[in-house]
């Protein structure tokens, strides 16, 4: 090793010794260990609303939305979707059953209700919901009431359920009326029949479901 290289190595070693000495004075003989910087305080996430609160909130707008109406005449005349929204599989099902549906075939009605399940979104608001094709022009639905919602929001709950059920079923099949019954503990607490004509051209955002139910002859028991 040349003299110049030796001097460089000694200078480097001397520098490291001095740095260790400084560290020893500052940290009491030991070098500090690396620690991750503490994470910045994050704002606490707002508490999620309880299930009951969510149901109460959505109950006030339950009737304002509904399924898109199935155009069975369109489905009969076309092999593929014309609306740009319906899936090929679903359209194929509609196309297959369109002729019998338009003829008022109750077996076709029943199969469509089972496959399409138009009331599937409402299961969290009731203990059970059934639907039945009574005739070519009439569907019937019965739901077993959610006890808590019935107790807290009786008329609003019943009317909201009734109107949403009617809207979804009228959108699903070309019937003229839907009869809805609400039961609790084996007793009928609500009964109403909505006709297509009564619901036609309504702005449901501004509709009072209780007033409409009474207009349609509803019985709150």
Give the residues covered by each predicted segment.
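Long, charge-dense low-complexity segments
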Residues: 1-221
């Amino acid at each position: 090793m040349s003299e110049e290289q030796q001097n460089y190595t000694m200078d480097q070693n001397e520098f490291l010794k001095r740095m260790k000495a400084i560290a020893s004075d500052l940290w009491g003989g030991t070098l500090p260990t690396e620690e991750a910087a503490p994470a910045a305080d994050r704002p606490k996430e707002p508490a999620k609303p309880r299930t009951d609160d969510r149901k109460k909130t959505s109950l006030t707008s339950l009737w304002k939305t509904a399924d898109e109406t199935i155009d069975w005449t369109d489905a009969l005349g076309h092999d593929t979707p014309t609306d740009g929204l319906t899936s090929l599989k679903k359209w194929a099902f509609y196309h297959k059953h369109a002729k019998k549906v338009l003829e008022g075939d109750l077996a076709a009605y029943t199969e469509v209700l089972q496959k399409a399940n138009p009331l599937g979104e409402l299961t969290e608001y009731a203990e059970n919901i059934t639907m039945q094709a009574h005739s070519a022009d009439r569907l019937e639905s019965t739901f077993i009431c959610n006890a808590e919602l019935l107790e807290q929001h009786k008329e609003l709950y019943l009317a909201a359920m009734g109107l949403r059920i009617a809207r979804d079923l009228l959108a699903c099949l070309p019937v003229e009326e839907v009869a809805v019954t609400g039961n609790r503990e084996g007793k009928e607490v609500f009964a109403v029949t909505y006709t297509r004509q009564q619901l036609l051209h309504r702005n449901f955002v501004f509709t009072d479901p209780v007033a409409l139910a009474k207009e349609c002859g509803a019985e709150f028991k």
